[in-house]
Amino acid sequence: LKLERGARTALFAPSGYGKTTLAMLLAGYLQPTAGEVLLDGAPLPKTGVCPVQLICQHPEKAINPRWRLARVLEESGALSDSVLDAFGIERAWLTRYPRELSGGELQRFCVARALMSGAQYLICDEISTMLDVITQAQIWNTVLAEAEKRNMAILAVTHNRNLAERIADEIVDLAKIS
């Protein structure tokens, strides 16, 4: 699998085909037992903010429950009013803890955190699966607009063929190659 800056690729397959495992390998969360993951011909950096950011399906597992949400966003650098506004993140939410927000609100924070990191490659692992259709559309429209502005590559990991066709220029069907 090769991702180019600015590309929009969907990794599509039914549940159980290893989509999330592959996403975690590509983002550096797991180490491959064979082969390698390279970024511009070199291994992913081991220190600093990684230019490959993974956004998981379950935002409650990706946020420290003891941190207020402003601190969660500050992990990736300075707060960006334009990103907060784009995702409809209210300033009052910044003083709250994760347990005080809905899953959709938390997912907005996870996506905003990844975008504020200066990522060059964004891996979106089923980021809208459990959200209502309005929140799904808002998140994807914002992610795609930001990716376009920044020439950022998007890898959308999904089991939803309609979503893959709507957001991606290329669809990699794991069921056909595994």
Show which residues each predicted segment covers.
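Q-loop/switch helix immediately C-terminal to the Walker
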Residues: 58, 65-79
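Hydrophobic anchor residue at the start of the ABC signature
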Residues: 111, 123, 139
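Helical segment within the ABC ATPase nucleotide-binding domain
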Residues: 137-150
